[in-house]
Amino acid sequence: MTLNKHVEYILLAEFDIDKGASLKHQHPTETGTDEHILSELMLPDGAHLRAEDWTIFCLNQLTPDPDQQQIVDEEHKSPLLYVLNLVRTKHDATARRGARVKAMAICTRHQYLHIYKPVLLLAMERYFENPTIEILESLYEAVNSMDLSRMPKFTWHERQILRASDNRTMFEEMFMDSPEEYDDPVDDEVRKKFIDLSSGHTKRPRMLGKDRHFFETKIEYEGIKLPIKIPLTVNPEEVGDFSVIKLINTFTPNINHYPGSLNPHHPHLDTPGSYTHPIMLLLNALLTQKRIIFLGHGHPSGEVANYVLAACALGSGCGTVLRGFTERAFPYTNLTSVDDLLKCPGFIAGVTNPTYEEHTSWWDILCNISTGKITVSKDLEYVRGRKGSIASSVKEEAIVSLSRSPSMNSYKDTNAQEEKKMVDTDAEFMQGVLSAIGAHYGETSIRAKFQDYVLKFVRLADLYEQEVCGLPAKESTLGYGPVFADEGAKKRELAANANRIEGWRQTISYKYYQKDQASRMENSCIQDLDVYRQISKLKKLKQIPDDEVLAIYEAFLNNTITHRQVIEFLSYLPQHQGGLSPLGVGLFHSNPLIREKALELFRRLERSPVGSKFIQDLSKFQKIAYERQAAKVE
């Protein structure tokens, strides 16, 4: 039996009435973490009050240093370990105090650590029956025997396409199903082979009805085969099975009875004013690296941990835009580790001890799960926009520029409109999010909205650095950066976001972004073209000169020649945002040259297995138009 290194350690802790929490076993070796700290994390406050509690915490966390030269591969070489911990309390009349409390943990590099819950439950039950090290040894062998050799390795762009698609067969050609799935002797001879006409070889057919967003495998433990579904669309900053929707619902106030925030004003957090939505305040705090505590007094530690993990996803744009949040996350921690916590800049931590609420110097933002309120610490430095500062200057310049507009009667009117715009942009975004949740949109759709929001923010920050800080503009065919209806809209956006952009530019995630962006641009298959910008033009601008539209389609054609280019191109057209529909408008353009180029682009995309699925998902109106025009040229 081949052992992989899916799991690094198995831990076992117990609560002793005389000694307190103690670490009893570490297998196969010691973790290197202080045993007292480990046992305290494995047996969280109040766990004995519940029959079962799941906890998540991290090991090997280092104070982040984005300036270090070593490049770390997050999936394979990262020292960060995620710990899935199960605490069980069993009432026993023969035990002192009438109960036995034990905790068993799996330490893994896998972000999808929740897949180990079923086997951990079985192992814990076995350990209560037979409390020996052999139980941990057999568990270690079972989880590391899980076969992932057939699991497809998606590129970043492929993963984003799969993530944004509801098509269960997307990338099906990359899967090799296990021969074990064809072991039915009754009809094996009938269906085990077919002739592939393209190659002339016999092949096994793929199993039908599988959701290719997951890889199916199994863990065999003590003779029991446990089916496992590994999510294939997980991004680097997404850990566990948290819910962003639950985070939003918990901290969204009743609008009809919301008097506005009573928190002290801070320009990084609530630029629009006291009616900033609490979730937007939290997002701004994440972007500007504030110290954040989630307090869940009386709540299971696992529930608190999931709020922390959801916040990490929120701030990172669900792992597609920024990174550096999970390395500063403490999904569950306690007073034993407070010194280590306070050494970490911009930590995001989950606690159940109400003592944290009293120590306002320990945190900048406190999110109380029980009350649904977000509090800004009175000790958070109150930063005023200084005269002549970058953030102040861009705001003043925008106001002065706008005040010269003939449509504005006075500076006062301009200022009022600008402030209203700053409120409206975020308020409209949150209204869209809440409406989607109310309409029962899924978790993936809600995460996608924050992914797009954070992406727009960092692209605006790039423009800010060029316009205000004097950094050189990025060279790109047909321009680079966000799209605005007019110059006034651009200045309003820069003014509204100046303070939090300045805050973000001082953070660890900003430094990582600079490195990652340089690497992405260097390794991109599509060079010298900002695809996102061109698609935004087709979506947002009402009137584009024919010459420019033609140039856009020609640029797309020139950059969708290889398979890798097609995949990268399609990743900019997520299907939950309409897929190819912005490009489909070209099929109806009054200019025959543009219709011709749009048709040529669609025909090229259709030759790709992935692109053909995008074509199938076109609206009926656009699909009929495409098929009719394609039939004429064949």
Indicate residue ranges for each PLM-predicted region.
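Short amphipathic alpha-helices and their capping/turn residues within compact interaction modules
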Residues: 15, 20, 26, 129, ...
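A eukaryote-biased sequence property
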Residues: 280, 309, 321, 328-634
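N-terminal uDENN/longin-like adaptor modules and analogous extended polar/low-complexity scaffolding regions
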Residues: 2-302, 309
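Amphipathic alpha-helical scaffolding segments
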Residues: 28-32, 119-129, 140-144, 305-318, ...
